[in-house]
């Protein structure tokens, strides 16, 4: 996608202490084959029968599935997505259908990148896609979503559609001598001026309706990770503006169709670092009651720059892909160890007590096709 995509990737781009923590690559975890093609900035979900579906992102319009209950597990290609290639969509299973919300892409080879507000659903029984007769209340890119029940999904966060789209329109229209000025003007603003979405939306697939469920207790974010367990929502880090992350983790309870926000927590600094920059594009999921968060990416030093008044906070800083894994154990966050390689912007899927990390972007910015997993077992973190 040329210069537009390069800029997009740039932008987007002590109770617990008594627990024995170890890293091992052997044990009980399930081994899955690599996905057929490298995947980053894609999306995925798992149905009630243990079948994982992943696609979009660098896979273009391709989608694949794998049945975790089969003895011989292989990826199978399903019908291609009809809505065009796109990145950063969110997908969940509702009423036995795979729903795909929003994303960012190009309508044709000549058009600039733009945010989508459309919704598609896939029938595994018929192997068919259908565009749903609805649009989201705001454009959805950099958003996150969690399934509430068989008919409802919670969606929040994401960039401001109009500001985001305008940036890529300006980049497309600028000649080479003007591009750096456009880029600087876009990044050199305080976080509040990006108007990231902080409204929480509930989509009801049965009624095909959208509902405003309130707002986040703090700033809107993009590129956050989210998980739902026993009616408790965890919204993990994300960008406050392009290049600047937050280390805050929002926590809420979903009860009687109402979201109640609880006390926030913060991810601890990585070993050897003075502060936690926060993560975008991290993997996350629960294993035996422990919330695990790993990978993602940030710009070390951007937070201090922003505190010092430098709005283009990541200017001149190399993006760093992370390999640290953190665990929330008995209400306390702790460092658990390292992944096999630094990785972010892949797909997290939980099944039983395993968290599968599918695809992602490595430290060279390249998509990978590997599938690894996190599992807590007898007080140990197994990475396979």
Curated annotation (Swiss-Prot):
Subcellular location(s) per record: Periplasm
GO molecular function: racemase and epimerase activity, acting on carbohydrates and derivatives
Domain of life: Bacteria
Catalytic activity annotation: N-acetyl-alpha-neuraminate = N-acetyl-beta-neuraminate
Active-site residues, Swiss-Prot/TrEMBL: 239 (proton acceptor)
Record EC number: 5.1.3.24
One GO term describing the cellular component: periplasmic space
EC category name: isomerase
Sorted UniProt keywords: Carbohydrate metabolism, Isomerase, Kelch repeat, Periplasm, Repeat, Signal
Record flagged with keyword Cell inner membrane: no
Coiled coil: none
Signal peptide: 1-29
First and last residues of every Kelch repeat: 51-95, 97-149, 151-184, 185-230, 233-282, 304-353, 355-384
NCBIfam families per record: muta_rot_YjhT, PRK14131.1
Function: Converts alpha-N-acetylneuranimic acid (Neu5Ac) to the beta-anomer, accelerating the equilibrium between the alpha- and beta-anomers. Probably facilitates sialidase-negative bacteria to compete successfully for limited amounts of extracellular Neu5Ac, which is likely taken up in the beta-anomer. In addition, the rapid removal of sialic acid from solution might be advantageous to the bacterium to damp down host responses.
Family: Belongs to the NanM family.
Subunit structure: Homodimer.
Protein name: N-acetylneuraminate epimerase
Gene: nanM
């Amino acid at each position: 996608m040329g210069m537009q995509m390069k800029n997009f990737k740039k932008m987007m781009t002590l109770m617990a202490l008594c627990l024995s923590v170890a890293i091992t690559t052997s044990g009980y975890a399930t081994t899955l084959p690599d996905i057929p093609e490298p995947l980053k900035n894609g999306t995925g979900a798992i149905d009630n029968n243990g079948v994982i579906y992943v696609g979009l992102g660098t896979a273009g319009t391709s989608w694949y599935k794998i049945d975790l209950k089969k003895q011989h597990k292989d990826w199978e290609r399903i019908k291609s997505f009809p809505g065009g290639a796109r990145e950063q969509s969110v997908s969940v299973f509702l009423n036995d259908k795979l729903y795909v919300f929003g994303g960012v892409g190009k309508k044709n080879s000549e058009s600039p990148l733009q945010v989508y507000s459309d919704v598609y659903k896939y029938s595994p029984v018929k192997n068919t896609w259908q565009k749903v007769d609805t649009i989201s209340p705001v454009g959805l890119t950099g958003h996150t979503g969690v399934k509430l029940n068989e008919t409802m999904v919670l969606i929040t966060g994401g960039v401001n559609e109009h500001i985001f789209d305008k940036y890529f329109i300006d980049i497309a229209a600028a000649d080479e001598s003007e591009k750096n000025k456009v880029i600087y003007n876009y990044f050199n603003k305080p976080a509040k001026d990006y108007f990231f979405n902080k409204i929480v939306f509930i989509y009801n697939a049965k009624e095909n309706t959208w509902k405003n469920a309130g707002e986040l207790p703090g700033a809107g974010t993009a590129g956050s990770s989210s998980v739902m367990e026993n009616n408790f929502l965890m919204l993990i880090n994300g960008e406050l503006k392009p290049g600047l992350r937050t280390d805050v983790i929002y926590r809420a309870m979903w009860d009687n169709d109402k979201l109640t926000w609880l006390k926030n927590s913060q991810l601890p600094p990585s070993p050897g670092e003075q502060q936690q920059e926060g993560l975008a594009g991290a993997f996350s999921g629960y294993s035996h009651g422990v919330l695990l968060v790993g990978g993602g990416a940030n710009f070390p030093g951007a937070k201090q720059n922003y505190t010092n008044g430098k709005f283009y906070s990541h200017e001149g800083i190399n993006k760093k892909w992370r390999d640290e894994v953190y665990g929330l154990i008995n209400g306390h966050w702790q460092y658990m160890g390292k992944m096999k390689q630094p990785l972010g912007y892949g797909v997290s899927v939980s099944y039983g007590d395993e968290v599968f990390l599918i695809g992602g972007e490595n430290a060279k910015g390249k998509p990978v096709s590997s599938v690894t997993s996190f599992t807590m077992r007898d007080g140990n973190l197994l990475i396979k």
